[in-house]
């Protein structure tokens, strides 16, 4: 009997995955053993249609395969069938020929595996529910002072109009916008207001407000206060659309409104206020004219779709819901929410592909009447995306749903989305990823997700087949979910009635609100990362992202509200309109991210470094949300390639990032231009560029980082054709293999600009070098890439490296890139490294690097014999340094080294995120050199364990969950001695580096001395726990 035991088998990185489309899913089986030095010599996999059938498998038996492969082993049996659960088990043989017990049965289940298996139709809510009122016919108006379309004072003006309305109103919708902000009331009741945005361009995004509950037959008074934030064009515009039995009636903003430039007395919003002395408003410009152009409101409600059906009185053996959306959806079946996913189906380029989800709903279906329902919201498909506004992919969110029910007698049936579904509006009045969600609990539709609900007044859906993407594929990455909750720690009241709740941690997600009050009471929740000096929330850095959730109470005891279709980056929540004073239990943070296990535990004797690790982890947690975003708070939240280029190696330490980044690499390849350029962001959106050094190269560096971390050869195989096209693009757009001096450069460096041609050519060489390594790992011809690298290297040295080792630009990043990418002649490496250290010393031992130089800075110093300088930089506490933001109270990584400046002021708000993981790329160095854990071979088949004591660090401990099993280290330096305990999992080996000038000084267990190198005694060990003492 073998001493090996299989633990936690997984398929495509997941234990028991539901809904795989992979034709040859990869199987992994970590192992455990009480005996040291255990390795696998062979394995046998069995696959069957039932757990009981594994002893005589009816699908596949690999037989005994002589191999030590135990991670990502492809299924090699007969073709898999769609919608089928496959059970599997594995046993292994050790090096002595002993066989293990069979692992406990596990399973994976296939999804639909192709377009032919879909019979559902795309459906959308009808036009009345998805189209916003047009402002055409309205005018931009202002107080009559000069020419407001050209220039008006920075001031507030007030406007009123009384209108006579009929008694048969069935709908009332107000569309309104102002340059810059407004508050609007109907008969004294405020129905909407806006706050000043950092870009002062909120007028580009007119609001759409349902005011049916506020209007009535007879005279109604509309009142607007509008403010011009600075000297310049001023105006506001609106249309009130009334639906009556006899048709539509529209009330426009025009010269019939009254206006004043003197702040009116209390009650000016009320119907009986005397405005006879107010002059008529002035038309500044007709809609479509003036400086504002053809601004258009956008309908952003989350509509409700439903369908009832009957099932026979037969025993159900299995039921699955396959669903997706153009937009976002949340499915319900017979009154129960389906699954726990948030923001499904996530973000892709919907023109090319959308991911579908698979849910086990066996326990939810029932004989007789059933109801399948869903909320459908705009999301990334039709809502605001980044700074580019709405409708980046389409205007009408749509749903695709297919419920498949199988019975014990072998029969089955499908219930699909189609023309027989019904649609209506609901309590989610608006839902936008950037602006936030507006929820009116008075509009809740009791029972609409359950059978027996009367939907005869609902509207018929319409088809959406013209908008369908090219491919519908099973979800590759984990779903977005609520991972944890954070209670509020403190409540302050910086202004009367304005409460600020501190969650203690900059996070991403939304909040749960608990509140009691009268029906119609409206509570506003605004989100921010930091506070102003006066204790109010600081929102200028959010730019146009309103980040505001609004809840209107229904007045039925304690009410709970959790937004469904938005997310925010925040630590602080401003609460206004709350009945009474909120307590710390009134608001709870709901932390949201793409689900994946966290894989790295790390602690040292230096509190600042422990906090740095926490900030790195929280930064990744918040920005790994469907795509790797640059920031989760402001109006951007895009999949910037440059950020993940530098952060991917760290990401693969701290979280299981294989599935998430594999999915994103598909997004990146979907965005690749026809001539081979990778885009600045993926999914590609807006008018951003492509072909940029250090950004587009993510198409090369990210697959390589994943391969190093997981040994996933399929990532390389999928990437190499696009990498080849990228290199052809770069070569085509070079002059003598030197790239042009354009792009973003060493973004946000500290007054130390590196020439952009140096950066671009260095990255060109680096991508060619990695392409050669990829080809070698895949058994393909690497010679063309090696030759390309050699030629670029020579051109680089000729153009940029002087005979004394100085590099053009003479900046820290110039030397960092040149040294780390092997572009300096060997004879000049020491001179270049010494020059780098001199530049650091000249800045009083501070760094000056930006996004591209920072991740390579400490590794280069270590590789060139300057680990002491690396530690000196790591421990710095003054600007610019990693310690500076921590001393300023950061709980995530900042976009800038000085997002909060030494005097307490904020950096420029246009580019000042407090949750931006790029500078967290230092984690890779910390985990490899302080924890001492790094891959010696791809996927940690061999582990390099090399803690490097230095600086203030005298002890550290870490555990890394590799695909083979946990790798751990714990070390301490004391009284001139050194103690290391480490463990590595079965079927791996480790090379352990002990700081000792002679192996005889090292006491150890199970280790074999192999060489002395670089002041260390190097030992080889097998699996198990080991102790080394100097």
Swiss-Prot record:
Chain intervals for the UniProt region annotation (Carbohydrate-binding module-67 (CBM67)): 133-297
Binding residues for alpha-L-rhamnose 2: 179-180, 203
Enzyme class: hydrolase
Source taxon at top rank: Bacteria
GO molecular function, one term: metal ion binding
Residues that, per the record, bind alpha-L-rhamnose 1: 630, 634-636, 643, 695, 916
Effect in UniProt of substituting residue 179 to A: Abrogates L-rhamnose binding
Annotated catalytic residues: 636 (proton donor), 895 (proton acceptor)
Keywords assigned: Calcium, Hydrolase, Metal-binding
Disulfide pattern: none
GO BP term, pick one: carbohydrate metabolic process
Domain comment, as recorded: The carbohydrate-binding module-67 (CBM67) binds L-rhamnose, it does not bind L-galactose or L-fucose, demonstrating that stereochemistry of the sugar at C4 and/or C2 are important specificity determinants. Also, removal of calcium through chelation or mutation abrogates L-rhamnose binding, confirming the importance of calcium in the binding of its ligand.
Family as reported in the entry's similarity comment: Belongs to the glycosyl hydrolase 78 family.
Official protein name in the record: Alpha-L-rhamnosidase
Species name: Streptomyces avermitilis (strain ATCC 31267 / DSM 46492 / JCM 5070 / NBRC 14893 / NCIMB 12804 / NRRL 8165 / MA-4680)
């Amino acid at each position: 009997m073998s001493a090996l035991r299989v633990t936690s088998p997984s398929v495509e990185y997941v234990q028991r995955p539901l809904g795989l489309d992979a034709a040859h899913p990869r199987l992994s089986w970590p192992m455990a053993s009480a005996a040291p030095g255990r390795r696998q010599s062979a394995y046998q996999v069995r696959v069957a249609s039932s757990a009981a059938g594994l002893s005589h498998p009816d699908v596949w038996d690999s037989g005994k395969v002589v191999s030590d492969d135990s991670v990502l082993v492809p299924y090699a049996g007969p073709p898999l069938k769609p919608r089928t659960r496959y059970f599997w088990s594995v046993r292994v043989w050790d090096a002595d020929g002993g066989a293990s017990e069979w692992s406990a049965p596990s399973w994976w289940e296939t999804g639909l595996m192709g377009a032919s298996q879909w019979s559902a139709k795309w459906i959308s809510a009808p036009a009345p529910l998805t189209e916003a009122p047009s402002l055409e016919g309205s005018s931009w108006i202002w107080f009559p002072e000069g020419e407001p379309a050209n220039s008006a004072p920075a001031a507030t003006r007030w406007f009123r109009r009384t209108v006579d309305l009929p008694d048969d109103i069935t709908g009332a919708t107000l569309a309104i916008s102002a340059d810059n902000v407004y508050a609007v009331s109907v008969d004294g009741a405020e129905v909407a207001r806006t706050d000043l945005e950092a870009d002062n361009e909120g007028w580009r995004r007119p609001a759409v407000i349902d005011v049916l509950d506020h209007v009535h037959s007879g005279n109604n008074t509309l009142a607007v206060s509008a403010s011009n934030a600075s000297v310049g064009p001023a105006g506001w515009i609106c249309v009130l659309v009334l639906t009556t039995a006899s048709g539509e009636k529209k009330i426009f903003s025009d010269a019939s409104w009254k206006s004043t430039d003197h702040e009116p007395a209390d009650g000016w919003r009320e119907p009986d206020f005397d405005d006879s002395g107010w002059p008529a408003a002035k038309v500044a410009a007709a809609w479509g004219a003036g400086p504002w152009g053809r601004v258009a409101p956008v309908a952003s409600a989350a509509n409700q779709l439903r369908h009832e059906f009957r099932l026979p009185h037969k025993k159900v053996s299995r039921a699955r819901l396959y669903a997706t959306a153009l937009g976002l959806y949340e499915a319900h079946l017979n009154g129960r929410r389906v699954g726990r996913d948030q923001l499904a189906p996530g973000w892709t380029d919907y023109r090319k592909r959308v991911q579908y989800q698979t849910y086990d709903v066996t326990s939810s279906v029932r004989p007789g009447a059933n109801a399948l329902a869903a909320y459908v919201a705009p999301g990334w498909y039709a809502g605001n995306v980044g700074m580019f506004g709405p409708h980046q992919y389409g205007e009408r969110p749509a749903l695709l749903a297919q419920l498949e029910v199988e019975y014990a007698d072998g029969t089955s049936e499908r219930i699909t989305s189609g023309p027989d579904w019904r649609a209506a509006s609901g309590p989610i009045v608006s839902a936008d990823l950037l602006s936030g969600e507006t929820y009116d609990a008075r509009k809740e539709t009791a029972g609409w997700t359950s059978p027996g609900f009367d939907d005869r007044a609902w509207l018929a859906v319409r088809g959406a087949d013209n908008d369908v993407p090219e491919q519908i594929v099973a979800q590759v990455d984990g779903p977005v979910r609520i991972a944890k909750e954070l209670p509020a720690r403190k409540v302050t009241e910086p202004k009367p009635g304005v409460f600020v709740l501190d969650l203690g941690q900059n996070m991403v997600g939304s909040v749960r609100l608990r509140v009691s009050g009268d029906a119609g009471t409206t509570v506003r929740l605004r989100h921010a990362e930091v506070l102003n000096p006066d204790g109010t929330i600081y929102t200028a850095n959010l730019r146009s992202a309103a980040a505001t959730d609004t809840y209107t109470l229904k007045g039925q005891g304690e009410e709970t509200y959790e937004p469904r279709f938005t997310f925010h980056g925040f630590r602080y929540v401003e609460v206004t309109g709350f009945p009474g004073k909120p307590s710390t239990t009134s608001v709870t943070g709901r932390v949201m991210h793409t689900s994946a296990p966290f894989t790295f535990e790390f602690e040292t004797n230096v509190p600042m470094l422990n906090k740095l690790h926490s900030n790195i982890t929280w930064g990744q947690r918040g920005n790994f949300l469907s795509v790797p975003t640059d920031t989760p708070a402001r109006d951007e939240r895009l999949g910037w390639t440059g950020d993940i280029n530098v952060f991917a190696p760290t990401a693969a330490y701290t979280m299981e990032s294989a599935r998430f980044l594999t999915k994103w690499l598909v997004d990146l390849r979907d965005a690749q231009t026809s001539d081979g350029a990778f885009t600045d962001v993926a999914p590609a959106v807006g008018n951003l560029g492509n072909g940029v050094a250090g950004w587009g190269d993510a198409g090369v560096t990210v697959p390589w980082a994943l391969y190093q971390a997981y040994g996933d050869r399929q990532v390389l195989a999928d990437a190499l054709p696009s990498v080849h096209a990228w290199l052809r693009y770069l070569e085509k757009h070079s002059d003598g293999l030197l790239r042009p001096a354009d792009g973003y450069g060493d973004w946000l460096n500290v007054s130390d600009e590196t020439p952009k041609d140096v950066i671009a050519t260095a990255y060109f060489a680096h991508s060619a070098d990695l392409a050669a390594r990829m080809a070698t790992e895949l058994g393909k011809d690497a010679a063309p890439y090696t030759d390309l690298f050699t030629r670029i290297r020579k051109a680089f040295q000729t153009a940029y490296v002087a005979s004394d080792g100085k590099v053009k630009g003479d900046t820290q990043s110039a030397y960092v890139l040149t040294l780390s990418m092997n572009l300096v002649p060997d004879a000049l490496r020491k001179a270049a490294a010494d020059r780098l250290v001199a530049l650091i010393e000249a800045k009083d031992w501070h760094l000056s690097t930006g996004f591209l130089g920072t991740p390579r800075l400490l590794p280069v110093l270590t590789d060139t014999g300057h680990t002491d300088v690396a530690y000196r930089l790591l421990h710095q506490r003054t600007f610019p340094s990693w310690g500076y933001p921590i001393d300023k109270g950061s709980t995530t990584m900042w976009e800038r080294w000085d997002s909060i400046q030494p005097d307490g002021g904020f950096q420029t708000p246009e580019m000042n995120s407090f949750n931006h993981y790029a500078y967290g790329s230092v984690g890779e160095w910390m985990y490899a050199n302080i924890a001492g854990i790094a891959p010696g071979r791809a996927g940690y088949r061999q582990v390099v364990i090399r803690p490097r004591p230095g600086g203030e660090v005298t002890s550290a401990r870490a555990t890394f969950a590799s695909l083979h099993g946990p790798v751990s280290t714990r070390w301490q330096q004391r009284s001139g001695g050194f103690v290391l305990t480490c463990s590595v999992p079965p079927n791996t080996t480790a090379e352990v580096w002990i700081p000792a000038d002679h192996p005889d000084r090292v006491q150890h267990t199970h280790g074999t001395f192999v060489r002395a190198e670089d002041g260390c005694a190097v030992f080889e060990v097998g699996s198990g726990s080991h102790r080394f003492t100097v």
